[in-house]
Curated annotation (Swiss-Prot):
Keywords: Repressor, Ribonucleoprotein, Ribosomal protein, RNA-binding, rRNA-binding, Translation regulation, tRNA-binding. This is Large ribosomal subunit protein uL1. It comes from the Bacteria. GO terms for molecular function: rRNA binding; structural constituent of ribosome; tRNA binding. Transmembrane segments: none annotated. CDD domains: Ribosomal_L1. Part of the 50S ribosomal subunit. GO terms for cellular component: large ribosomal subunit. Signal peptide: none annotated. One of its GO terms (biological process) is translation. It comes from Chloroflexus aggregans (strain MD-66 / DSM 9485). InterPro entries: Ribosom_uL1_bac-type, Ribosomal_uL1, Ribosomal_uL1-like, Ribosomal_uL1/biogenesis, Ribosomal_uL1_3-a/b-sand, Ribosomal_uL1_CS. Binds directly to 23S rRNA. The L1 stalk is quite mobile in the ribosome, and is involved in E site tRNA release. Protein L1 is also a translational repressor protein, it controls the translation of the L11 operon by binding to its mRNA. The gene is rplA. Belongs to the universal ribosomal protein uL1 family.
Amino acid sequence: MPKHGKKYLAALAKVDRSRFYTPAEAIALVKETSYTKFDATVEAHLRLGIDPRHADQNIRTTVALPHGTGKTVRVLVFAQGEALQTALDAGADYAGSDDLIARIDRENFFDFDVAIATPDMMGKVGRIGRKLGPRGLMPNPKSGTVVQPADLARTIREVKGGRVEIRNDKTGILHVAIGKVSFTSQQLSENLAALMEAVKAAKPSGAKGTYIRSVTLTSTMGPGVPVDLVAVQNLKL
């Protein structure tokens, strides 16, 4: 069992593990128990009633957080022709075709957070899938990162503005950043509400029993705060 420092234990002592907090109480407690010197990330962890061994029960969708995550998102776009210029005009940090693919392959260049591609580029991008895939950077229609040129500018703006991918891990748990400790409680609440709506909308038809089984909020390195399931699922934007 890992040893925790005095600051963590002091923060943990403020959390009553025998109760479930309303979203407002949980957010306030997460802010109160954050002890890092930097502006910590606030994360929501959702345990779902899905069987990740079945492909049709895995969650992979996106949500546009109304207040973003507080993180600067670096976007790389695989495009050519007019679409390449569209990407640059829309604020892509990097855009290119064969040259960019070669750079990633040759230099192991991964100085970006999200990769987007137009459909005509996917055949070429597939050649570096072995490098992008394990890092979660491979463009995919399910995550909204393979888009037609006409939708490219909007997609880039959404990603930079706070659109995040929701994807369960191999144990059926979602880990999603919903902002920073410096955000107001209202901003965090609205981001959490948007996340809950997206997760409910993405419920697989094959999921049996209770779908959302637990929700926990935490800050970077901080203790988890259990949230009341009924209250959090009734959050409205």
